[in-house]
């Protein structure tokens, strides 16, 4: 989108605050339905970020796949769960919650220090220097594929690991 800089900055701040509030809603709301709706807000804000950066195909894929399919599937699965058994003897904070939060905070701090201390030069082995790319002959989906295999190789692989963890967690919850 061709927006003026103040409007673009306002939309970035607005979408960023929507992402932060939605993310907090996902992890802090006790009702799983509200948590799933907060996840939908996060995914919609992410797709709007893609629209702001002129990546319309990625934004449409984000909306169709994640909001339209996966989030609806999550809400559908949560509605079939028996919610009353999850709220019996509800304690606001337990010892396990404290231990878990300390482990998560320490992992987060170690991850941030690792990311800031790592030299990321040379991580991606396939670079643009050893490829002959004619931009005129490539479609948008081919350009996305090239970017995913060159510039965004590491984030793409990290997202696949996160999705694999989510799938394993969903299977573990479903088996109980």
Curated annotation (Swiss-Prot):
GO molecular function: NADH dehydrogenase (ubiquinone) activity; quinone binding
GO cellular component, as recorded: chloroplast thylakoid membrane
Record-linked InterPro entries: NAD(P)H-Q_Oxidoreduct_6 (IPR050290), NADH_UbQ/plastoQ_OxRdtase_su6 (IPR001457), Nuo/plastoQ_OxRdtase_6_NuoJ (IPR042106)
E.C. designation(s): 7.1.1.-
UniProt catalytic activity: a plastoquinone + NADH + (n+1) H(+)(in) = a plastoquinol + NAD(+) + n H(+)(out); a plastoquinone + NADPH + (n+1) H(+)(in) = a plastoquinol + NADP(+) + n H(+)(out)
Transmembrane regions: 10-30, 32-52, 61-81, 92-112, 152-172
Subcellular location as annotated: Plastid, Chloroplast thylakoid membrane
Topology class, membrane: Multi-pass membrane protein
Physiological role: NDH shuttles electrons from NAD(P)H:plastoquinone, via FMN and iron-sulfur (Fe-S) centers, to quinones in the photosynthetic chain and possibly in a chloroplast respiratory chain. The immediate electron acceptor for the enzyme in this species is believed to be plastoquinone. Couples the redox reaction to proton translocation, and thus conserves the redox energy in a proton gradient.
Family of this protein: Belongs to the complex I subunit 6 family.
Protein name: NAD(P)H-quinone oxidoreductase subunit 6, chloroplastic
Organism, as annotated: Atropa belladonna (Belladonna)
